[in-house]
Regions:
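A general structural motif at alpha-helix termini
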Residues: 9, 61, 96, 135-138
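Buried hydrophobic packing segments
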Residues: 5, 9, 24-29, 134
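Short, amphipathic C-terminal "tail helix"
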Residues: 101-150
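Short coil/turn segments at secondary-structure boundaries
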Residues: 1-5, 70, 93-96, 122-129, ...
Length: 150
C-alpha cells in the first residue's frame, strides 16, 4: 500500500518517489498493524501477523517494546526520527503541495492508489476511504503516535 500510494502521490504532485514513500510510511505501518476486517485477495498466511512482523523489525533495530502494540509504535517513531535526522519532509504539506489542490485531487488519487498493482500485496485490503484517510493524515502533520485508520 505504501508503494502504491507513493506511486500516485509522486506522479500527481512531482514528489520524488523515495520522499513520497517516507512521508506516508508511518501512517501505513499504523494502518497495517491493525487487525483487518478483510485480508488481501490471496494472503500468504491464515491469520493476521503484520503487527507481529513490524514488532520483529522494531526489536531487530533496537526499539522493541513490552507488547506488540508498543513495539509497532516504537518502530513508527523510529521511522519518523530518521526522517527528521535526515532533514526530510515529514508531511505531504511540507513537500510543498498546496492544500486546496491536494484535497481537490484526493478522491481520484486514492482511487488510483487502490487500483495500483502493488496494493494487492498489502496485508490489509484497504477501502478507498481508508486510503483517503491515510493521505489526509500524512498531509497535515508529522506522525503523532497511536493514530489509527479504520
Amino acid at each position: 500500500l505504501n508503494h502504491s500510494m507513493a506511486h500516485k502521490l509522486g506522479g500527481e504532485f512531482h514528489i520524488p518517489h523515495g520522499r513520497a514513500n517516507a512521508v506516508i510510511l508511518p501512517y501505513v505501518i499504523a494502518y497495517n498493524a491493525q487487525k483487518p476486517t478483510k485480508f488481501t485477495a490471496f494472503p500468504k498466511y491464515e491469520t493476521f501477523i503484520a503487527d507481529k512482523k513490524y514488532a520483529k523489525i522494531a526489536a531487530f533495530i533496537g526499539c522493541g517494546g513490552h507488547t506488540t502494540e508498543e513495539s509497532v509504535q516504537n518502530l513508527i517513531k523510529a521511522v519518523y526520527r530518521l526522517e527528521q535526522e535526515l532533514d526530510c519532509p515529514t508531511s505531504i504539506k511540507e513537500c510543498g503541495v498546496d492544500e486546496k489542490l491536494f484535497f481537490d485531487r484526493l478522491p481520484a488519487l486514492a482511487e488510483r492508489a487502490h487500483e495500483d498493482q502493488c496494493t494487492t500485496a498489502n496485508p490489509r485490503y484497504p477501502l478507498i476511504s481508508e486510503i483517503e484517510e491515510i493521505y489526509t493524515q500524512a498531509y497535515f502533520a508529522p506522525y503523532q503516535g497511536s493514530q489509527s485508520v479504520h
